[in-house]
């Protein structure tokens, strides 16, 4: 069976540095940080009192007010980015076979804000007997965003959620890619969203010592590959890609951002939360993606790394890149856009895939901000080009995006410039 080619025809993003794809990209290229004091709850007694929040998000711009009240913030973000991506794709819902359009959209955590609110209310009032919102469960569960998007458009194709912590939305893109190239759908709306900047989310990650505590300077806290890094910065938001079978896209005259070349998945099988110190899972996932794409490592121009600004993770990923790419590792560009957006958890892969695609489209590699001269880690080879502090113009024909999640879940997707 000949596999079909898959292209990207629509993009949607709401992030801490922009509430649309154009705004997101402009701020990435300009090295703008989305970090600031937490406003979603009173974090004054927390070790970490800052995060990368989405600013000025009004769900009612995208959803009827009554329907919005039935959704957790993570689902509201999902619906909003799906609307941008579907509109951007130019899909004519009236003319399409909706049985051949699917939705694969995930969250690493899901409705934690709803869970906190409902369980908190119960704890306060339990002597009066249980009283829960009838929408508690559907607001909380991590699959509901995919369901809401399909209901909104009437898409009857493959529909489910992925959940693999921070690899979630890359897995969603990978599944969409595989289903389309096998002929199971004409198009799939794929991606992820997350809204876990809440007391349980921040408190839980603080308890693990996973978050930066650079409270005096939030905008400089996310500093991947710098010696003074002290943990990741929580972010929130959503990213959505419309993946489409090439001939279907061409037949309707769709614009094509890029082609999906290949995907890879692997497991560290090492630790619940820490990546393998030698980067074994990271190495394997990149090799798997390159094999799937039938691509030589020397063809890759840009890697959007997982690069969370954690002490162990950044070292292991840098090691893996050197092992996979050899001498070419010093020729390609590497950057972590998490230095600006923070870590969007389940939404990270989709948002970073969009950054990778726009690097191809625009010939610009966004920077890794916040690196200071002399702030070098002896365990990291700075002959690698981490694109520190300033975007770089270069031709990008092939971009690779890594995402690694708690539990040892690793996912990688490769995009390439579309050509007939």
Question: Language-model features: where?
Answer:
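ACP-dependent fatty acid/polyketide chain-elongation machinery
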Residues: 1-67, 247-257, 354-368, 416-420
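Condensing-enzyme catalytic core mediating Claisen C-C bond formation in acyl metabolism
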Residues: 5-9, 36, 216-293, 302, ...
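Active-site-proximal alpha-helical scaffold in enzymes
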Residues: 78-91, 145, 150-153, 158-194, ...
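Phosphate/pyrophosphate-binding loops at sites that engage ATP/ADP/AMP, CoA/4′-phosphopantetheine
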Residues: 85-97, 249-256, 286-302, 324-328
